[in-house]
């Protein structure tokens, strides 16, 4: 897949998302706008299908740089696309507001969530997301948020740090790394840079490949903790489904097992029917599920896409469709 000319990073599983979501006119919501790559592809598909008239794409992001980049691209579709600053946990309110202002029904035809950190954010050392670049221990998706990675590393005790590294990073050496962080704080004072943290992890986990894996897990864990990503994901799944129209679809791209597991379990739980107590033998369920999985299992990137865009290697796409069941 060639690099998209209108995105500041390669949008992952682009064709798979468009094929699953674009099926007619209506309200389309990109809850993780980023550079606008997915949104632009959706708009082009709507245009080529003759569905642009009567459609609106709402792109949501809390990153000011992303909004600036994507907003300039969405301007190519005046009146049909809008970039909105906000956290995607407010997806229903933000999308409904924009739809009503444009005279559309506040029910979404499709919702897309591309989770995780964009390549642009990782590449910017001052954002503090990567152990490969020296920068401040920040890791905030929303630069106006109060808590940084440095705050957590310097304020939490050993038990709290170990819990963060284990729960959010699934790091097997979580306790040893937490002890090393506390020791470094006592010896050298507060941690301030990504290099400080990377050096601590390397002092505990030896060997190039093991240390790289642990570095990835520890930095992931801190990013999730700083941005409360799993709590937010649970809310955005519930909020997103609530604003979906009957027959509307929600597509979620995740990049690590914690996110994918949460999405899989949520879709499965919402697809179950309530047949009442065992032994009653009802002919019809008391209530039907609100979702039907469109993808039986997670969709992964092709070998060709992974070759062109290595970031797609860990991506998993799950899609579900809203039914007429009672939520």
Curated annotation (Swiss-Prot):
Main localization category: cytoplasm
Mitochondrion found in the keyword field: no
Pfam families, per database record: Methyltransf_5 (PF01795)
Listed GO MF terms: rRNA (cytosine-N4-)-methyltransferase activity
UniProt binding sites for S-adenosyl-L-methionine: 36-38, 61, 88, 114, 121
GO cellular component terms given for this protein: cytoplasm
Catalytically driven reaction(s): cytidine(1402) in 16S rRNA + S-adenosyl-L-methionine = N(4)-methylcytidine(1402) in 16S rRNA + S-adenosyl-L-homocysteine + H(+)
Alphabetic keyword roster: Cytoplasm, Methyltransferase, rRNA processing, S-adenosyl-L-methionine, Transferase
InterPro entries per UniProt: RsmH, SAM-dep_MeTrfase_MraW_recog, SAM-dependent_MTases_sf
Keyword Endoplasmic reticulum applies: no
GO biological process: rRNA base methylation
EC number of this enzyme: 2.1.1.199
Family named by the database record: Belongs to the methyltransferase superfamily. RsmH family.
Function: Specifically methylates the N4 position of cytidine in position 1402 (C1402) of 16S rRNA.
PANTHER family in alphabetical order: 12S RRNA N4-METHYLCYTIDINE METHYLTRANSFERASE (PTHR11265:SF0), S-ADENOSYL-METHYLTRANSFERASE MRAW (PTHR11265)
Protein name: Ribosomal RNA small subunit methyltransferase H
Lineage: Bacteria, Pseudomonadati, Chlorobiota, Chlorobiia, Chlorobiales
């Amino acid at each position: 897949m060639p690099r998209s000319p209108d995105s500041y990073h390669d949008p992952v599983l682009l064709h798979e998302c468009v094929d699953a979501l674009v099926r007619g006119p209506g309200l389309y919501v990109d809850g993780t706008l980023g550079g606008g790559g997915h949104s632009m592809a959706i708009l082009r598909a709507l245009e080529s299908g003759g569905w642009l008239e009567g459609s609106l794409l709402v792109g949501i992001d809390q990153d000011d740089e992303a909004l600036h980049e994507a907003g300039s691209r969405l301007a190519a579709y005046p009146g049909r696309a809008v970039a909105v600053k906000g956290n995607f946990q407010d997806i229903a309110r933000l999308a409904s507001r924009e739809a009503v202002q444009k005279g559309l029904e506040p029910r979404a035809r499709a919702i897309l969530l591309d989770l995780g950190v964009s390549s642009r954010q990782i590449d910017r050392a001052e954002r503090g997301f990567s152990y490969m670049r020296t920068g401040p221990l920040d890791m905030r998706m929303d630069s106006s948020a109060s808590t940084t990675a440095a705050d957590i590393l310097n304020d939490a005790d050993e038990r709290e740090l170990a819990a963060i590294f284990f729960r959010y990073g699934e790091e097997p050496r979580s306790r040893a790394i937490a002890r090393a962080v506390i020791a470094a704080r006592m010896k050298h004072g507060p941690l301030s840079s990504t290099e400080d943290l990377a050096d601590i992890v390397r002092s505990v986990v030896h060997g190039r490949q093991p240390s790289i894996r642990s570095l990835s897990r520890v930095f992931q864990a801190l990013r999730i903790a700083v941005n409360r990503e799993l709590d937010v994901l649970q809310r955005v799944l519930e909020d997103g489904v609530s604003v979906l129209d009957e027959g509307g679809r929600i597509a979620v791209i995740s990049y690590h097992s914690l996110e994918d597991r949460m999405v899989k379990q949520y879709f499965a739980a919402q697809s179950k029917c309530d047949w009442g107590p065992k032994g009653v033998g009802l002919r019809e369920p008391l209530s039907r599920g609100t979702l039907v999985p469109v993808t039986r299992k997670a969709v992964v990137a092709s070998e060709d896409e992974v070759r062109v865009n290595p970031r797609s290697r860990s991506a998993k796409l799950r899609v579900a469709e809203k039914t007429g069941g009672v939520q």
